[in-house]
């Protein structure tokens, strides 16, 4: 079967790889000059199979009000007269209950664990290198209240069989020795030892090369304009360089997916939540992280990527804008220099990307109401973590094969009739 994938980020490329392995003739179309040049370019570098939590959680509405007045706030809200933004926010608020949080977190952990297995197998069969490390994620707590509040995450990890360790201050330092200089600033942590780190951009580029060797055609520098539907199925995708036809189509355009689907009468509740990162050359390894440290106070991840530190995080709801705010950079700099001052900040690269977020935090993977049109989008902050599992799952769905994990609650249908997820 001929399959056209729209989008060459990590989700589009993993989808292409698995579809090609399944024997399909695959073409990937993207407006950029190569793979992973938008949201997949400089994300935080976490591959956090255990650290999967919905942003929509009990207490978040109250915390959000407090964050609005913080200098280094993890959440920035710039309201617009935008029905899509308002509807998305209302649905997200509806997911901020204990019951919804447990359901959504369980879905995320299921897909993340599947992706862990898929990534390990893919790494074995391809031997690609992407500055990967397998030393876990340390969620770092600066206050006793944060440590106490982590009990709900520990409960969910235990219920889903995800390995974890609750650490005191000294144990945190044994895991991340550079924290010794900041011991007075921390009280403890939660370690998920099976988590990994890696450069998503490097991974996606190398996997694109492997996919090309399997026959995948990458058509870069081609802007997607609209989908053509006739007789209940897609008959082509119109681009600035003509129309591409296929037997099946996969929309993997991240935050831009809803804009392509809306004219077809398909409402995909995905909205861009901007994140920021700094990539800092290491000058003193003894003051740098070994793996990923999640600074719970600022919701910022500090990750070791070879000879660089990647600092990423924050959530800015401001629509489709990639402008770089100086205040956001100061927050990233504050977090990393406070804990790991081993980089040359004068040579840091500042970046932003639009994460495609659903109101419940879980991606949308699978069929639509149009027979040959599929979606693989809405992974939010966990696109890198969930990429291999999502690509493999999508390939099974398109191929009509039995999926290896339950996927009914990952489908777009969970939002039918005004449901919240």
Curated annotation (Swiss-Prot):
Keywords: FAD, Flavoprotein, Oxidoreductase. The keyword Ribosomal protein does not apply. It catalyses: a D-alpha-amino acid + A + H2O = a 2-oxocarboxylate + AH2 + NH4(+). GO terms for molecular function: D-amino-acid dehydrogenase activity. One of its GO terms (cellular component) is plasma membrane. Gene3D superfamilies: D-Amino Acid Oxidase, subunit A, domain 2, FAD/NAD(P)-binding domain. Belongs to the DadA oxidoreductase family. Oxidative deamination of D-amino acids. This is D-amino acid dehydrogenase. It comes from Allorhizobium ampelinum (strain ATCC BAA-846 / DSM 112012 / S4) (Agrobacterium vitis (strain S4)). The lineage of its organism: Bacteria, Pseudomonadati, Pseudomonadota, Alphaproteobacteria, Hyphomicrobiales.
């Amino acid at each position: 079967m001929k399959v056209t994938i729209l989008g060459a980020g990590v989700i589009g490329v993993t989808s292409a790889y698995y579809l090609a392995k399944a024997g399909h003739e695959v073409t990937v179309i993207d407006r950029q000059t190569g793979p992973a040049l938008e949201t997949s370019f400089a994300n935080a570098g976490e591959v956090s199979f255990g650290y999967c939590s919905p942003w929509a959680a009990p207490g978040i509405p109250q915390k959000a009000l407090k964050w609005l007045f913080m200098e280094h706030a993890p959440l920035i809200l710039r309201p617009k007269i935008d029905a899509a933004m308002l509807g998305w926010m209302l649905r997200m608020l509806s997911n901020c209950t204990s019951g919804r949080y447990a359901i959504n977190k369980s879905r995320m952990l299921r897909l993340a664990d599947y992706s862990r297995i898929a990534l390990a197998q893919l790494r074995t069969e391809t031997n690609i290198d992407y500055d990967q490390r397998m030393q876990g994620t340390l969620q770092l707590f600066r206050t006793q209240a944060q440590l106490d509040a982590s009990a709900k995450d520990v409960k969910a990890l235990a219920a889903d069989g995800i390995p974890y360790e609750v650490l005191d201050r000294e144990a945190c330092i044994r895991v991340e020795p550079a924290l010794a200089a900041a011991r007075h600033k921390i009280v403890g942590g939660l370690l998920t030892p099976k988590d990994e780190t890696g450069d998503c951009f490097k991974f996606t580029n190398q996997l694109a090369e492997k996919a090309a060797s399997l026959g995948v055609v990458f058509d870069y520098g081609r802007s997607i304009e609209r989908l053509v539907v006739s007789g209940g199925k897609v008959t082509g995708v119109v681009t600035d360089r003509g129309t591409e036809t296929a037997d099946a189509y996969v929309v993997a355009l991240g935050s831009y997916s809803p804009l392509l689907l809306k004219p077809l009468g398909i409402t995909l509740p995905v909205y861009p939540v901007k994140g920021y990162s700094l990539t800092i050359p290491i000058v003193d390894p003894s003051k740098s992280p070994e793996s990923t440290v999640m600074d719970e106070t600022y919701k910022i991840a500090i990750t070791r990527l070879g000879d660089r530190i990647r600092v990423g995080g924050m959530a800015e709801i401001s629509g489709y804008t990639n402008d770089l705010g100086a205040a956001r950079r100061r927050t990233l700099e504050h977090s990393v220099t406070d804990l790991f001052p081993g980089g040359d900040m004068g040579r840091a690269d500042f970046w932003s990307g639009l994460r495609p977020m659903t109101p419940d935090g879980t991606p949308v993977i699978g069929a639509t109401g149009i027979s040959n049109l599929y979606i693989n989008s809405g992974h939010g902050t966990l696109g890198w973590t969930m990429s291999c599992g999502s690509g493999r799952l999508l390939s099974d769905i398109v191929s009509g094969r039995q999926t290896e994990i339950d996927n009914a609650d990952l489908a777009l249908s969970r939002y039918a009739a005004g449901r919240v997820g």
